[in-house]
A protein has these predicted regions:
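Short, conserved beta-turn/loop elements at beta-strand boundaries and strand-helix junctions
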Residues: 34, 49, 70, 93-97, ...
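Bacterial N-terminal signal peptides
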Residues: 6-15
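Beta-strand/loop subdomains of soluble extracytoplasmic proteins
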Residues: 71-75, 80-89, 123-129, 140-153, ...
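Active-site region of chymotrypsin-like
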Residues: 25-31, 36-37, 42-45, 105-115, ...
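Conserved active-site neighborhood of the chymotrypsin/trypsin-like protease fold
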Residues: 58-140, 174, 199, 319-321
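N-terminal activation segment of mature serine protease catalytic domains
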Residues: 19-65, 74, 123-128, 212-226, ...
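Terminal peptide-recognition signature
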Residues: 27-29, 54, 60, 64, ...
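C-terminal recognition in membrane/secretory proteostasis and scaffolding
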Residues: 58, 66, 89, 103-105, ...
Length: 480
């Protein structure tokens, strides 16, 4: 009996030691990446070396941040206290949620490594521990902090998506990205971003977002976090609520904009959203999600692509129950592009490229101020305010490469193309067709924002085109 108890004690001791050493399953990641030059889209930037963190999950995979592996030409991973590097590649990446899964070519890499279990959303005031490989050293680092709030925030990686995140005062520094945030030997988050100018403020991606990502890739394809295609606004005014015959004083938010075809099919502007996916919607547009008051959009984004979300709305003095389809917007020009090289068309020294957030970011840190109201309106707002005038792919004259054929042009770039040879330009294909199908003696290019037009001699432009490409080292006149 004594022998049995000793063995049982040793077994339990080993389990405790193993559970208390999650760092063995935390991986150091080295990337060698090369981003395009969005202002000169035929070029690429210099190769950049960076480090990040990750951790082992079920299925012999490594979870990390999407931004850690974006534009990576080569990825190397290294185990805890092991100097040997191993080649890895991206299996799945979700830029909208800033998560990625890596696979390692050497199957022996995972021998002896225990997958870290994914826990639940931590409560405010919980103590959490971050583990990773921050910049400034080679060894693993541990920091502790307290969960201060849970809310939807803008994810820096896509730039235009707000998903659930947890704020903590645990240090999350460059290199920590992708590492696990632990509580009670379970992963309660993936470290991913801080706030410039604020000390002791870091954010991690919580289990609901992680589990959504993992469920999404079960069919071997990542779709993303869907949207309902609506915009909510508060409905606080008691007089207006009385006018609408709403009885509950704090239930229901106004649907003030419909941004997708599916939303327009089922809903009307000025409908009142009472409930979404079982969550009552407060007058201030929030819902109570696992004990946290967060924006009601989470009721739709936590659904899977092409699923239907049950909703209750108030319309014409009565309650309606509907099922609202939600979809991922694959043509979202507002979201940062992380793998596909930018499109361009080069003709007579004129470089054309689509208007996108990535293109505007090439203007510098204060890109929104440099871009001006006209370009911001075209990119962000026109499709909602003037859908009939919205372009599927607005085209920019990015720059003009100097040559005698274009020497007299006064407009030298960073302007929106409105039409070419009298044909409205809604996409890059429209632009190319307008140039190549034109038989007149001159090309007339009209620009947006009432900037006027420029004119090119067609025969001279055609003769000069190849020479200009060779002079500036451009191998192809287009990339689509």
């Amino acid at each position: 009996m004594k022998t049995i108890l000793i063995h049982l004690f040793l077994f339990l001791f080993l389990l405790i030691v193993e559970a208390a050493e999650p760092e063995k399953s935390v991986i150091q990641i080295f990337t060698f990446s090369q981003e395009p030059d969005w202002d000169e889209p035929w070029n690429s930037s210099q190769v950049r070396r960076a480090t990040g963190s990750g951790f082992v999950i079920e299925g012999d995979r490594i979870m990390t941040n999407a931004h850690v592996v974006s534009w990576a030409k080569q990825i190397m991973v290294r185990r805890f206290q092991d100097s040997r590097p191993h080649l890895a590649q991206v299996a799945y990446v979700g830029h909208d949620c800033d998560l990625a899964l890596l696979e390692v070519e050497d199957e022996t890499f995972f021998e002896g490594l225990k997958p870290l279990p994914i826990g639940v959303l931590p409560e405010v005031r919980s103590v959490v521990n971050t583990i990773g490989y921050p910049a400034g050293g080679e060894q693993i680092s541990y920091t502790s902090g307290v969960v201060s709030r849970v809310e939807l925030i803008n994810y820096v990686q896509p730039g235009n998506r707000s998903l659930l995140a947890v704020q903590t005062d645990a240090a999350i520094n460059p290199g920590n990205s992708g590492g696990p945030v632990m509580m009670d030997d379970q992963v309660v988050g993936v470290a991913f971003q801080g706030t410039p100018g604020l000390e002791n403020t870091g954010f991690f991606i919580p289990p609901p977002v992680i589990q959504h990502f993992l469920k999404d890739v079960q069919d071997t394809h990542y779709h993303g976090f869907p949207q309902a295609g609506i915009r909510l606004s508060p409905l606080i005014n008691p007089a207006y609520r009385k006018y609408l015959k709403l009885e509950a004083p704090d239930l229901g938010a106004r649907i003030d904009t419909l941004m997708s075809d599916s939303a327009k099919e089922f809903l009307r502007e000025d409908d009142v959203l009472l409930e979404a996916n079982g969550y009552p919607v407060s007058a201030d547009t929030t819902i109570l999600y696992e004990g946290n008051q967060v924006h009601g959009g989470i009721a739709f984004s936590q659904a899977q692509h092409k699923s239907k979300v049950p909703v209750k709305i108030w319309r014409d003095g009565g309650e309606l129950e509907l099922e609202l389809p939600v979809f991922v917007n694959y043509k979202d020009r507002l979201e940062g592009n992380q793998y596909v090289p930018p499109k361009y068309f080069a003709y007579a020294g004129l470089i054309f490229t689509p208007l996108s957030r990535d293109y505007l970011s090439s203007f510098g840190q204060n890109w929104s101020a440099v871009a001006g109201i006209g370009l911001l309106y075209e990119l962000f707002y026109r499709k909602n305010t003037e859908p009939e005038r919205s372009r599927t792919e607005p085209v920019m004259l990015s720059t003009v490469l100097a040559h005698p054929v274009n020497a007299n042009m006064e407009i030298r770039g960073r302007v929106l193309v409105d039409s070419v040879n009298g044909k409205r330009i809604d996409s890059m294909n429209d632009l190319i067709k307008a140039f190549e199908s034109h038989e007149g003696s001159h090309h007339l290019i009209e620009f947006g924002e009432r900037l006027g037009f420029e004119c090119l001699d067609r025969d001279a432009a055609n003769r000069a085109n190849n020479q200009i490409l060779q002079t500036y080292g451009i191998q192809l006149d287009r990339q689509l």
